[in-house]
């Protein structure tokens, strides 16, 4: 018999110590990785529930196992909420991750060797949009598109590439692009060559849900997203569509299960259902509006201090610092800021002279700091501290001074009060 008072602390001290150290790290460090966020205790409650015990291969009402009457309710709640939140008429909440959702789309629509137009990773795309080290770049013929000298997507070049290469699918979406994507324009280009238009909105899903960023669902044939990042739910994936036929939706479902996954993670799907409900609250819209304001506030400080921001600004939750002119590598900037308890990630910039393991830039995002209560004033102050570190990257005294300021503001604005 299992006893509810069983706990990790009494049983596995080594594991518990690492878990507790991570709790301290999250509370005492400022998190600026654009893809990270803090999920609510309600989501964590769902993920730690007895739903983790249940196998449920198949879909609500069509399971391969018995005893699924209650997990059917859980999954249907998640499906219905996803459709309502994003204005879709189809949703699959089973993908274990955003990458798994993307795998399912590729598998449903394409054959190996088909041509795909995707955003260049160095210009802000994602691994699953055609990187040669990823399944997408290995199995499909990838033609990359990118940004122009102003840092905006070059739609003329995209249209030209589409006309020349006649891809079966065009991918919209990004992991490090700070502009507004013209989804309607991309759909127009896709329609001109009879291609699928697939959008990966993983980074901006929360902004989209709150009406702060344009919704791709009315324009794309298929949309995928993660359920964490700006959406602030559990780590997982989601597939959405609107206006498609039942044959397409059946292909997508079959591509997820049994095509690429087995049993769904019902405890995570419950977490998705909670997060989707939270995203419908008025407070969530206020949060997302503040995310965008904080990112803009930080950009203004970096520009004032003489730092180059790719595209010159941001219209979402993230931006890229280009450090080429400062003769600082992304790797060194990442490490120095880390010693000041400020967490970022090194990132390639357009025409980067450095390797992806070194890079010439850092990516900065505002979802996590906004979640813990930062407003524009704190965001500007933080950006100033970061400039102090980068201006004196080898001065440990400066780094230590900034670290003490970081610890103070983290104590004032805890993640979990």
From Swiss-Prot:
Cofactor: pyridoxal 5'-phosphate
Cystine pairs: none
Catalysed reaction equations from the record: (6R)-5,10-methylene-5,6,7,8-tetrahydrofolate + glycine + H2O = (6S)-5,6,7,8-tetrahydrofolate + L-serine
PROSITE patterns xref list: SHMT
Complex formation: Homodimer.
UniProt-listed Enzyme Commission number(s): 2.1.2.1
Pathway(s) where this gene product acts: One-carbon metabolism; tetrahydrofolate interconversion; Amino-acid biosynthesis; glycine biosynthesis; glycine from L-serine: step 1/1
Record keywords, A-Z: Amino-acid biosynthesis, Cytoplasm, One-carbon metabolism, Pyridoxal phosphate, Transferase
Protein name: Serine hydroxymethyltransferase
Gene Ontology MF annotations: glycine hydroxymethyltransferase activity; pyridoxal phosphate binding
Listed GO CC annotations: cytoplasm; cytosol
UniProt similarity note: Belongs to the SHMT family.
Residues the record lists as N6-(pyridoxal phosphate)lysine modifications: 229
Xref: InterPro entries: PyrdxlP-dep_Trfase (IPR015424), PyrdxlP-dep_Trfase_major (IPR015421), PyrdxlP-dep_Trfase_small (IPR015422), Ser_HO-MeTrfase (IPR001085), Ser_HO-MeTrfase-like (IPR049943), Ser_HO-MeTrfase_PLP_BS (IPR019798), SHMT-like_dom (IPR039429)
């Amino acid at each position: 018999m299992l006893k509810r008072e069983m706990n990790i602390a009494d049983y596995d001290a080594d594991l518990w110590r690492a878990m507790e150290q991570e709790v301290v790290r999250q509370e005492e460090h400022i998190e600026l990785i654009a893809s990270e966020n803090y999920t609510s205790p309600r989501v964590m409650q769902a993920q730690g529930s007895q739903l983790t015990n249940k196998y449920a291969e198949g879909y609500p009402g069509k399971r391969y196992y018995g005893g699924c009457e209650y997990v059917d309710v859980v999954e249907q709640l998640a499906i219905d909420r996803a459709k309502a939140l994003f204005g879709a008429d189809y949703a699959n909440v089973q993908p274990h991750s955003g990458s798994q959702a993307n795998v399912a789309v590729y598998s449903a629509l394409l054959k190996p060797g088909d041509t795909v137009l995707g955003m260049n990773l160095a210009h802000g795309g994602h691994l699953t949009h055609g990187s040669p080290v990823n399944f997408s770049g290995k199995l499909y013929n990838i033609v990359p598109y990118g940004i122009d000298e102003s840092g905006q997507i070059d739609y003329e070049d995209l249209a030209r590439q589409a006309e020349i290469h006649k891809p079966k699918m065009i991918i919209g979406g990004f992991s490090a692009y700070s502009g507004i994507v013209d989804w309607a324009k991309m759909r127009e280009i896709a329609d001109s060559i009879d291609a699928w238009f697939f959008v990966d909105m993983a980074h901006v899903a929360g902004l989209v849900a709150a009406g702060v960023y344009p919704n791709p669902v009315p324009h794309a044939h298929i949309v995928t997203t993660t359920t964490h990042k700006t959406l602030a739910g559990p780590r997982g994936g989601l597939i959405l569509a609107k206006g498609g036929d039942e044959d397409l939706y059946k292909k997508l479902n079959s591509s997820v299960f049994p095509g690429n996954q087995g049993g769904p993670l019902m405890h995570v799907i419950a977490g998705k259902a909670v997060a989707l409900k939270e995203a419908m609250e008025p407070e969530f819209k206020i949060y997302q509006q503040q995310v965008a304001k904080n990112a803009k506030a930080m950009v203004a400080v970096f520009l004032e201090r003489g730092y180059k921001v790719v595209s010159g600004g941001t219209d979402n939750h993230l931006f890229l610092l280009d450090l080429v002119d400062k003769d600082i590598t992304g790797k060194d900037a990442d490490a120095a800021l880390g010693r000041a308890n400020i967490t970022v990630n090194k990132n390639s910039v357009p025409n980067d002279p450095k390797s992806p393991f070194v890079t010439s830039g850092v990516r900065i995002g505002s979802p996590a700091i906004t979640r813990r209560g930062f407003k524009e004033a704190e965001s500007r102050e933080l950006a100033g501290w970061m400039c102090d570190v980068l201006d004196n990257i080898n001065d440990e005294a400066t780094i230590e001074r900034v670290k003490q300021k970081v610890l103070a503001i983290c104590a004032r604005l805890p993640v979990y009060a």
